[in-house]
């Protein structure tokens, strides 16, 4: 899939149901495809039955290389969305983010593409992945857009990272790029 996906605009895969006793696909399959294909991956959670994906989009923004890659990859979807929101967490801890202007950079970038966004107030939470998923549910989000593995996978494995949490627990489809 990773090799064939390199010549695709978007790879769409389902996430393994971790409650299955003998899953057909390895639990880390979405992660593997994202890390090795060089293409955006749309991951659909098990049991997702809503009629829409991409009408109400939430971008998890931290000004990283992975984050802008995901946003750029999502532009065709964002142009058709009814609502695009940008959320940032712990902006005071991000070396590449000016806390006073947080979100204005990505809002301007998207405006150049004709996409109107709502920049949510910066959030503070030490469990970003869990907080992001909860906020997504509160906002009736039907697509999360985020960069995957801004830190090394080893660090995420040790500390429990946003990517790992979202990949493992999201009930909302996720578009990720690395």
What are these regions (language model features)?
Residues 1-11, 112-144, 150-157, 172:
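Structural beta-alpha unit
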Residues 1-87, 168-178:
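Intrinsically disordered or low-complexity boundary/linker segments at protein termini
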Residues 2, 54-55, 70, 95-100, ...:
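Short, well-ordered secondary-structure micro-motifs
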Residues 19-20, 92-97, 124-126, 152-153:
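Short, small-residue-enriched loops and turns at beta-alpha junctions
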Residues 26-29, 100-104, 135, 158-163:
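Charged helix-capping and loop-helix junction motifs
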Residues 31, 72, 108, 133, ...:
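Active-site phosphate/pyrophosphate- and oxyanion-stabilizing loops and adjacent acidic/basic residues
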Residues 84-113, 134:
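Acidic, proline/glycine-rich short linear motifs
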Residues 88, 121, 147-148, 176-178:
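Active-site proximal loops enriched in glycine and acidic residues that flank catalytic Cys/His/Asp
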């Amino acid at each position: 899939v990773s090799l064939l996906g390199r010549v695709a605009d978007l790879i769409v895969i389902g996430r393994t149901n971790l409650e299955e006793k003998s899953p057909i696909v390895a639990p880390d399959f979405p992660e593997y495809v994202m890390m090795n294909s060089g293409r955006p991956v749309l991951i659909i959670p098990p049991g997702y039955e809503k009629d829409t994906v991409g009408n109400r989009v939430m971008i998890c923004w931290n000004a990283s290389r992975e984050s802008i890659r995901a946003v750029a990859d999502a532009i065709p979807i964002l142009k058709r969305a009814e609502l695009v929101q940008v959320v940032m967490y712990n902006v005071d801890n991000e070396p590449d983010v000016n806390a006073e202007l947080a979100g204005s950079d990505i809002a301007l970038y998207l405006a150049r593409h004709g996409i109107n966004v709502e920049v949510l107030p910066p959030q503070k939470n030490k469990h970003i992945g869990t907080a992001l998923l909860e906020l997504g549910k509160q906002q009736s989000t039907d697509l999360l857009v985020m960069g995957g593995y801004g830190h090394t996978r080893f660090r995420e494995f040790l500390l429990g990272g946003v990517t790992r949490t979202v990949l493992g627990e999201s009930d909302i489809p996720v578009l990720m790029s690395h």
